[in-house]
Design a protein with these regions (language model features):
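Fe-S ferredoxin-like electron-transfer domains
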Residues: 71-148, 152-164, 191-209
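Conserved small/polar residues in nucleotide/adenosyl-binding loops
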Residues: 266-273
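Iron-sulfur cluster-binding cysteine motifs and their immediate structural context
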Residues: 53-58, 115, 124, 135, ...
Length: 273
């Protein structure tokens, strides 16, 4: 009886093994071995700055793509993309390097505090309760949700201005700070030649007089910048100007005519102590 039981169990196990083997072959998902090779040369930050869900997703996209144009690992940059191109036997793609930009210049001097917030130091929480400690309900709250979201120590709150500042040497344009900001004042913009760019450092949609009363550096929607721009790179919508970085040629005419200094020529972040 024992022998029969052993033989029966062995037969059942053998049949089960055959079925499992057949199923594994039938439902096997093939993965191109080059994906693992590409993933090995990537930094492994899994920041999502490339637009894909982690380094594995980006590696898969590189392998499947006919061309590497438009594909860029923001952490590794050109050197890493050159390695990827070598592995895949493709030409290294071209992609404009991006950087996070804080579109607020409401410093402590330009945007005086009118009240004091003693709640949890979180921009997300504070923004659900009220507009902030100043008369501008659009600007940087300065509680550092973007700082906490950044995995690269690339953004900090300047204690002198109360505004978030980006260290572009560390910024990988992963977009974590953009998602963390409840005021939507942080955006990814083209780094520009020699890390120079012009942007409107304000998102206040109030009418000119109200915006100027809340902050001395506010955009008042006067439209002088748009009229002066020879490249049609500037539009004024909802009382605030916006510069299309794909059209801007850094002629600086908008900077010269802006009455409040909202149009900024950005060169490099202020050094931190």
């Amino acid at each position: 009886m024992i022998l029969i039981a052993v033989i029966s169990l062995g037969a059942i196990g053998a049949v089960g093994a055959v079925f499992l083997y057949a199923a594994s072959k039938k439902f096997e998902v093939y993965e191109d071995p080059r994906i693992a090779q590409v993933q090995e040369v990537l930094p492994g930050a899994n920041c999502g700055g490339c637009g894909y869900p982690g380094c594995a997703g980006f590696a898969g996209a590189c392998v499947k793509a006919d061309s590497l144009d438009g594909l860029l690992c923001p952490v590794g940059g050109g050197p890493v993309m050159a390695k990827v191109a070598t592995i895949l036997g493709k030409e290294a793609g071209t992609a404009e390097p991006m950087v996070a930009v804080v579109r607020c210049n409401g410093t402590c001097q330009a945007r005086p505090r009118t009240n004091s917030y003693d709640g949890t130091k979180s921009c997300a929480i504070a923004s659900t309760l009220y507009g902030g400690e100043t008369n501008c309900s659009f600007g940087c709250l300065g509680y550092g949700d973007c700082v906490n979201a950044c995995a690269f120590d690339a953004i900090h709150i300047n204690p002198a201005t109360g505004i978030a500042e980006v260290d572009e040497e560390k910024c990988t344009s992963c977009g974590a700070c953009v998602k963390a900001c409840p005021k939507n004042i942080i955006e990814l913009r083209k780094k520009g030649p020699k890390s120079r760019r012009i942007y409107v450092s304000c998102v206040n949609k109030d009418k000119g007089a109200a915006a100027r009363k809340a902050c001395a550096n506010a955009c008042i929607g006067c439209g002088k910048c748009a009229k002066e721009c020879p490249f049609e790179a500037i539009t004024v919508t909802n009382n605030v100007a916006y510069i299309d970085y794909t059209k801007c040629r850094l002629c600086r005419k908008c900077v010269a005519v802006c009455p409040t200094g909202a149009c900024l020529l950005y060169t490099s972040p202020s050094p931190r102590d």
